[in-house]
Amino acid sequence: MADIELRFHHDMLTLSAPISYVLEKQGVDVAEDLEFVNLLEPDTVRDALKMQLTAGAQCLVANTEGICASRLAHKRMEDRQAEIAQAAVKVARECSPQHLICEIGPTGLPLDPSSKASVKQSVGQYAAAARALGDEGVDAFLLNGMDGVCDMRCAIEGVRSVSARPIFASFDVDGQGMVEGHGIMLADAISQLRDGADVYGFTTSADPVSAADTSRAAAQA
């Protein structure tokens, strides 16, 4: 059992925010270089992450959202996936957080739930991403912003196939509590996934009252 699991249902854990805004303010082209800055400017990434710890985050989320090979392929860097992943983990670990979480974002590939080949490809992408990040010093994986329930299921299956670390699964939802672009309530999405992930969450731009309603409904799923 990872140490972070001992805190589930006992402590309120705060995850660090994405550092893309800070890096952009410092002149980094986050649309093109967000993953590569781990290799090129580790000190810049380290300083941005340390700011999150100073703000009180117990869980530091590594700068690895775009680590899937299909995403790196757009920049012709898929063959450096492991190098980029390990650089990001190293920089985050050097900040000495209470807990280190590695984020994996969507593959960006088309996914046909009715096609075994399509599903297998997606699962393989997520498995390779988790394998590149490794388990050493990593307390959990954050699967963030996947494109609907099927994509999230593929991500969970892929990570589970190579790691026993806890999984945090987070959806993007609208003001009505629906998974963006998929016409399904967050609570229903979680119910479909059942016990696939250890922790479920969501990102929303909704007002606090609506967000609280979504949270309560999801907690009952």
Annotate each PLM feature:
Residues 1-221:
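Domain-level signal for soluble alpha/beta catalytic cores
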